[in-house]
């Protein structure tokens, strides 16, 4: 046989290496010097050798095991906190397995099975599932904020508590494991975990380190309808942590985030100390309607029978600053008759854009030989001499005329009429007011739309018809037309809206702000809640108004190069002006319809113009962020929400995040350091200092008042008690009733019992029983006043004839704590009548608490077909306008948000792991979608108190055709201040009837 020399086993070699490594770690942890370690190692070797030489028995194997055991006992004793078991390392940061080093990889780069990987992450979810053989599978969902993944670990049951002590939700950890496709859910996971280490929070946390800090005056929360993605609490918390003195909450058209912002100051769970000087500035971004601007600009009393020139122009674009006129068409009208015409092409001296050629059918060859505007404009003005100018959407046409007059040094002030405004006034049934739509409505033909000469002729005929309609309304001059033209509610609903920031300065301003919200939802709602300028002026006391963003009327006026008098009129309306970072408005650069903005330089020019206007008119200019999400990375949530709602540009998110003072100073560095500091720091703090620290929720209780309710309740209860128990009441009945009534009356709750009593009795009179629900059955006063049929006294027998009662017999006592109706039937020992079995043994404290001061919650089940009558009867009790349905707020639910996220990535061909979709879903839930009403909740307002003292009001889901009015706030926000009746609908009373 060919024998080979025995070779050392690789397994033994690996085991030896592992032992050496562990010994080295032990020595390192014990802080032994290399010399000491070497000496101890030599001593151990010598001792082992001596023992080996002196022992020649066959028990060599046993001796080796004893030596090994002693060595590891010694090693274990040298460690301070190394516990062994699932921890294989003495490093205190190691919570499982062995220590490991190396670079981690981002989760987004893990797209398939890659073998062993190291990752850093935050634990999102922890789930422990016990399986067979006394083992548990620990399922972790983790994220590094580039992606998410599931980690699976198999542990012995006794190991689970110690591992989950460190591996818990929110923990930042480093894992070493193997990527694999899970055979149960076919998802890529990480398993075979060989090490877990604790690490510090690796997120990049922005802090505001500026010694002087700004104040953000323009913030949207999740209550901005499917737009903002940050909670009010998170915004307030961040501003407070950054050391800002205040932050403004300004949602689109609503104030429903106010209660949440106010809870930030709560004694329990609040993120801001109650005695802090930090302020929340309460406001909204209103949809402002300029009902003060007349149909006629610069009116001077001209007669409607006077001279008018109706004209139209075609241009190379939309901005009078960067675009040129290519055609002018005009018609002269005198005393309602067309008397002359003017028509000409104009050479723009630049190529006509393709889209304009497609729209107007005017090409370069048609204008090549035409005169330029320097030649044409004086001739056109001569044609217009002595006449009032008329155009459809006149601000656009006149902006080009006035800009070219300015360039040529010609007069720039003209009286002009807008036929769009006339159409809104005279044709209220129309929803759109384009020229062809208006022409069709008044029976005028339009042959070649978007040609100046034809549009002018059509507009002239429309104008002549409108003048005839004005005569029928006794309107004979332009001043009267202006006075009557924009006052109707219907007209206001069809005027364009502009954004404006409205802030409440004090308690008066808060109430006035709530009145604006109520009116904008109840009276002026059309697609959005509208605030007419006239209404704002009426309620201006205690309010500040700012010019808002690029959707504000000042910014829009600058884009269209409105005349200086118009700009001055707009600036004077506002208390302060706003400018915003260039990124907020960069979307306009790529917008083909926006010829005014072609670069960042154009955006800078507009911001500088606003700053200049602020200096000119002594208005503070503030730099705001128009915050829609907290941090730059949070834009993904808004992107998904907008994509889910059909916005084609959802992926082009503007950087609408909350910036630090340094970031804002850098944004506006082009203004110079001094001016940048003024708009970023000085003026924002100045506005904040003008505003008092107020509470959006009135702190006091305001129960309704019904005269003599205290005495009435006493009388009703005792009359019923005597009717049931006889002239001499049992002591237990009298004592319980007195105790309850004293508690109810002393805390001001008698009126609530009387209201419920009136509703129940009215329903009974009309033939419908009413069932009580909840803990009201524990109140004997409720039983005696007819609110409930539940008797909360201990079980007892009661004779309906002679009033005999039995509370104390041994037979009755056996049913203590149980229901009296379960006692055996019994005959009255006095008169022979069958006894009633009463009592459910419910303590009164169940209803009103141990001190009797808990707010009573009386829930009543009315017949479903009678419920509306019961609601209306509350108005009979308290008077019209004193009761409101309890409002609710519908937000984006988790399942719906999951669909939004899943569809977003599928439509873009991107695969996302299920756990990453769930992480993003959390950022999308809770965003306001709609409003509704509690099925039976009625809020009752005391007589003589306005509802806006507590909350604005609106129609549920903003249904303009509904006659139901609900609270604007979710009713939970105010149910501690106003009485809420629960008048619920139920099938049982209907079926019993």
Residue ranges of each PLM-predicted region?
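Phosphodiester-processing cores and adjacent nucleic acid-binding clamps
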Residues: 48, 52-61, 89-315, 319-324, ...
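Short, intrinsically disordered, charge-balanced linker/junction segments flanking boundaries
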Residues: 22, 991-992
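A short interface-forming secondary-structure element
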Residues: 1-21
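Non-catalytic interaction/regulatory segments
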Residues: 21, 44-81
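Low-complexity, glycine/alanine/valine/leucine- and proline-rich hydrophobic stretches
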Residues: 14-15, 952-976
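A short amphipathic beta-strand at an alpha->beta junction
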Residues: 20-50
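Prokaryote-biased recognition of long, low-complexity C-terminal linker/tail segments
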Residues: 69-94, 108
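Short, conserved charged micro-motifs
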Residues: 8-14, 511-512, 947-949
């Amino acid at each position: 046989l060919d024998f080979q020399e025995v070779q050392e086993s690789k397994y033994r070699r690996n085991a030896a290496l592992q032992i050496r490594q562990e010994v080295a770690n032990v020595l390192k942890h014990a802080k032994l010097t290399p010399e000491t370690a070497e000496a101890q190692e030599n001593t151990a070797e010598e001792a082992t050798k001596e023992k080996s030489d002196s022992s020649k028995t066959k028990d060599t194997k046993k001796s080796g095991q004893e030596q090994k055991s002693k060595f590891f006992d010694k090693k274990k004793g040298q460690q301070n906190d190394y516990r062994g078991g699932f921890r294989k390392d003495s490093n205190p940061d190691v919570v499982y397995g062995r220590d490991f080093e190396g670079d981690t990889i981002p989760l987004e780069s893990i797209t398939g099975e890659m073998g062993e990987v190291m990752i850093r992450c935050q634990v999102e979810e922890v789930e422990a599932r016990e399986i067979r053989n006394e083992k548990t599978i620990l399922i972790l969902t983790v994220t590094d904020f580039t992606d998410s993944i599931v980690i699976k670990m198999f542990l012995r049951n006794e190991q689970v508590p110690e591992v989950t002590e460190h591996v818990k939700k929110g923990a930042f950890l480093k894992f070493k494991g193997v990527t694999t496709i899970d055979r149960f859910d076919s998802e890529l996971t990480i398993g075979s975990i060989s090490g877990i280490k604790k690490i510090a929070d690796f997120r990049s946390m922005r802090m505001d380190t500026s010694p002087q800090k700004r104040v953000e005056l323009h913030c949207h929360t999740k209550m901005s309808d499917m737009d903002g993605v940050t909670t009010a609490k998170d915004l307030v918390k961040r501003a407070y942590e950054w050391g800002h003195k205040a932050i403004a909450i300004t949602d689109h058209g609503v104030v429903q985030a106010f209660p949440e912002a106010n809870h930030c100051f709560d004694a329990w769970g609040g993120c801001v100390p109650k005695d802090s000087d930090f302020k929340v500035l309460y406001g909204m971004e209103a949809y402002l309607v300029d009902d003060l601007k007349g149909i006629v600009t610069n009116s001077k009393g001209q007669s409607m029978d006077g001279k008018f020139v109706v004209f139209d122009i075609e241009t190379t674009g939309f901005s009078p600053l960067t675009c040129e006129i290519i055609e002018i068409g005009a018609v002269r009208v005198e005393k309602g008759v067309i008397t002359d015409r003017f028509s000409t092409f104009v050479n723009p001296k630049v190529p006509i854009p393709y889209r304009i050629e497609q729209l107007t059918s005017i090409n370069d060859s048609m204008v090549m030989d035409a005169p330029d505007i320097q030649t044409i404009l004086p001739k056109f003005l001569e044609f217009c001499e002595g006449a009032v100018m008329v155009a459809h959407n006149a601000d656009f046409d006149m902006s080009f005329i006035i800009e070219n007059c300015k360039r040529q040094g010609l007069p720039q002030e003209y009286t002009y009429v807008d036929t769009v405004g006339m159409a809104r006034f005279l044709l209220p049934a129309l929803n759109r007011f384009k020229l062809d739509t208006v022409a069709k409505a008044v029976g005028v033909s339009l042959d070649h739309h978007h040609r100046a000469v034809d549009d002018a002729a059509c507009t002239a005929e429309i104008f002549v018809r409108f003048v005839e309609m004005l005569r029928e309304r006794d309107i004979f001059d332009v001043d009267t037309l202006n006075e009557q033209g924009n006052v109707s509610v219907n007209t206001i609903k069809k005027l364009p809206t502009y954004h404006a920031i409205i802030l409440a300065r004090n308690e008066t301003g808060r109430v006035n702000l709530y009145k604006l919200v109520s009116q904008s939802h109840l009276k002026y709602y059309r697609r959005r809640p509208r605030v007419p300028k006239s209404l704002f002026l009426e309620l201006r006391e205690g309010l500040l108004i700012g010019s808002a963003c690029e959707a504000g009327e000042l910014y829009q006026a600058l884009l269209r190069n409105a005349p200086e008098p118009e700009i001055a009129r707009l600036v004077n309306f506002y208390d302060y002006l706003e400018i915003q970072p260039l990124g907020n408005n960069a979307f306009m650069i790529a917008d083909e319809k926006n010829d005014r903005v072609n670069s960042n330089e154009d955006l800078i020019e507009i911001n500088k113009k606003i700053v200049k206007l602020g200096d000119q008119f002594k208005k503070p200019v503030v730099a705001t962020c128009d915050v829609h999400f907290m941090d730059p990375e949070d834009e993904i949530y808004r992107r998904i929400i907008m994509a889910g709602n059909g916005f084609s540009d959802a992926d082009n998110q503007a950087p609408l995040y909350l910036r630090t003072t340094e970031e804002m100073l850098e944004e506006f560095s082009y203004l110079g350091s001094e001016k940048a500091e003024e708009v970023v720091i000085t003026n924002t703090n100045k506005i904040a200092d003008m505003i008092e620290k107020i509470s959006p929720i009135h702190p006091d209780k305001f129960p309704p008042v019904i005269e003599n309710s205290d005495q009435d309740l006493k009388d009703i209860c005792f009359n019923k008690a005597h009717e049931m128990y006889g002239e001499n009441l049992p002591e237990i009945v009298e004592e319980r009733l007195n105790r309850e009534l004293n508690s109810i009356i002393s805390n001001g709750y008698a009126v609530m019992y009387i209201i419920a009593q009136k509703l129940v009795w009215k329903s009974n009179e009309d033939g419908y029983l009413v069932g009580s629900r909840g803990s009201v059955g524990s109140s004997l006063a409720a039983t005696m006043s007819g609110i409930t049929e539940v008797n909360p006294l201990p079980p007892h027998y009661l004779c309906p004839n002679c009033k005999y009662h039995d509370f104390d017999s041994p037979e009755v006592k056996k049913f203590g704590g149980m229901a009296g109706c379960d006692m055996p039937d019994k005959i009255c020992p006095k008169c022979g009548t069958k006894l009633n079995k009463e009592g459910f043994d419910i303590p009164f404290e169940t209803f009103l608490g141990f001190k009797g001061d808990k707010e009573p919650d009386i829930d009543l089940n009315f017949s479903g077909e009678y419920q509306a009558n019961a609601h209306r009867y509350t108005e009979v009790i308290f008077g019209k306008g004193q009761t409101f349905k309890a409002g609710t707020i519908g937000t984006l639910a988790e399942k719906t948000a999951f669909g939004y996220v899943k569809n977003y990535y599928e439509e873009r061909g991107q695969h996302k792991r299920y756990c990453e979709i769930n992480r993003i879903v959390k950022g999308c839930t809770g965003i306001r979608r709609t409003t509704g009403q509690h099925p039976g909740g009625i809020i009752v307002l005391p007589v003589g108190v306005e509802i806006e003292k507590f909350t604005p009001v609106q129609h549920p889901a903003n249904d303009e055709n509904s006659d139901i009015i609900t609270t604007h706030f979710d009713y939970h926000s105010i149910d501690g201040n106003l009485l809420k009746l629960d008048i619920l609908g139920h099938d049982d009373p209907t079926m019993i009837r």
